[in-house]
Structure formats: structure tokens, C-alpha cells
């Protein structure tokens, strides 16, 4: 993989959303200094007010360098001491994944985006076939205005794929989805897909938006 990502999903305690965002901003400053690209994305429809704290690296070596830097970091010792003394949220899940497109770099995600995310659990031995289907769909979705990124799960998300559609704003998302209605190439693709062997199950489908870096 090129673009390697770790995702930490947090939920703020009641009345603590602002404090959690402040804590994430402090963590992001440390992670950035140690070589990671950081984005903070709030879930929207289809979720339960979760916030993704996302770390990205260009490759495995950069990923490992950041991990090693954390081991002896006084900044992290101080950060976790402060956070533990006044916790503002609870981590609900964490997982790692790699972008199947090896030309994509972590810096390609710098900026603010709106996301539509589908999470799939693939049947054993069917990962390559699912990627091929995803890539066929990718061409149609990009013609409709989406930027498509496909992640294959690693630690914490074995047998999972995250199919991510990215847009500059909500208006762009709406315009893209409008192009995928009845009579469109996407509608035809979905009809054909319904006749294929089932090799994966969709387990989650939600929108999100960048709220910090």
C-alpha cells in the first residue's frame, strides 16, 4: 500500500463535545510533528454522533517511524496525563487499512471534504474479486462527480473494505447522487450487480464531514 490509515472512532461524553475537539486538536499537533497527516471527521447521517480521528502516512516506513516516535515521547506522556485527569469522550473502535490504489499519498487528503462511506465484509477468498467489482463501480461514480478511495482493512477490521466517496461540499454530493438515478449508468450497474454472486455484505453506510486537521 501507499496511503496507510489508522482510524480512531470517538464519542463525546454529554456536554463534552467542545472539550473533546480541543483534546483532538492537541493530539493532532503532536501527531503532525511526528510525521502523520491528521484529519478529524464528524459522522453525519447513518451514525451516532461519532468522530473519526484519522491518521495517514505515505507508506509503511513512515507509519513505523511515527509509531516509534510515540514510544519515548514526553509530549504524549503529558497529553495522556491531562486527558486522563479530565476525560471528554470514549473510544468506540479503532482500525487500520491500506488504500488499494498505490498511487495515492497521504497528502492527497489534506483539505476539507464531505464523505459517503460504505463498509463491506467480504467472504473468505473473495477479496480480489470484490476489489475488481469496486473498481468497475469506481469509473461510473467518478464520471458522476465523486472521488473514490477504496481501503482494505487490516488490524481491527479484518475482512472489511471501506468504500469512500469524497466531495468538496454537500452540494457536490447532491449533484453527484442526482446523476445516479433511474436510467443512469449507475442504475444499470446496480441491476447487473444484483444478478451476480453475493461475495460481501454491507455492514454500514453513513456520511461524514471534515471538521478539523
Spans of model-derived segments:
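Short S/T/G/P-rich N-terminal loop/turn motif that feeds into the first structured element of a domain
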Residues: 1-213
Amino acid at each position: 500500500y501507499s496511503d496507510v490509515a489508522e482510524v480512531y472512532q470517538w464519542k463525546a461524553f454529554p456536554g463534552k463535545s467542545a472539550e473533546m475537539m480541543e483534546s483532538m486538536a492537541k493530539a493532532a499537533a503532536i501527531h503532525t510533528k511526528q510525521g502523520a497527516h491528521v484529519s478529524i471527521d464528524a459522522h453525519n447521517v447513518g451514525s451516532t454522533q461519532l468522530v473519526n480521528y484519522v491518521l495517514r502516512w505515505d507508506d509503511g516506513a513512515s507509519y513505523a517511524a511515527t509509531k516509534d516516535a510515540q514510544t519515548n515521547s514526553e509530549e504524549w506522556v503529558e497529553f495522556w496525563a491531562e486527558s486522563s485527569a479530565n476525560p471528554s469522550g470514549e473510544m468506540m473502535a479503532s482500525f487500520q487499512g491500506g488504500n488499494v490504489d498505490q498511487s495515492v499519498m497521504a497528502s492527497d487528503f489534506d483539505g476539507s471534504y464531505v464523505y459517503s462511506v460504505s463498509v463491506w465484509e467480504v467472504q473468505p477468498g473473495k477479496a480480489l474479486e470484490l476489489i475488481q467489482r469496486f473498481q468497475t463501480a469506481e469509473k461510473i461514480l467518478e464520471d458522476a462527480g465523486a472521488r473514490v478511495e477504496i481501503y482494505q482493512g487490516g488490524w481491527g477490521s479484518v475482512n472489511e473494505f471501506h468504500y469512500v466517496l469524497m466531495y468538496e461540499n454537500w452540494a457536490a454530493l447532491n449533484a453527484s447522487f442526482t446523476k445516479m438515478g433511474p436510467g443512469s449508468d449507475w442504475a444499470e450497474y446496480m441491476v447487473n450487480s444484483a444478478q451476480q454472486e453475493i461475495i460481501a455484505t454491507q455492514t454500514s453506510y453513513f456520511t461524514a464531514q471534515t471538521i478539523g486537521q
